[in-house]
Regions:
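Substrate-binding/active-site clefts of carbohydrate-active enzymes
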Residues: 1-86
Length: 86
């Protein structure tokens, strides 16, 4: 196909139903819907063997919970990490 890079959705653990990667719940764990950490490493290695770059999208400005139960987020699991609700 001639491409030399792949850009994929965020791979961090998401809240239930967050298939797209933009409802982060735990930034230290991978979304199991996308496979294991080893699967990711293997995929990146296979791409690099073919001179294909892999870019992973990231969400740097929010977590994915829809309520005030901040305890489900890692590492930002306290309300003091967030602005007050508008």
């Amino acid at each position: 196909m001639g491409f030399d890079a792949i850009w994929i959705s965020p791979i961090v653990d998401n809240r239930d139903g967050g298939y797209h990667g933009y409802w982060a719940r735990n930034i230290y764990e991978l979304n199991q819907n996308f496979g294991s950490e080893q699967d990711f490493i293997d995929m990146v290695s296979a791409c690099h063997e073919r001179n294909i770059l892999v870019m992973v999208d990231v969400v740097a400005n929010h977590m994915g919970n829809l309520d005030t139960n901040f305890g489900v987020n890692t590492p930002f699991n306290d309300g003091s990490h967030y602005h007050d609700w508008c």
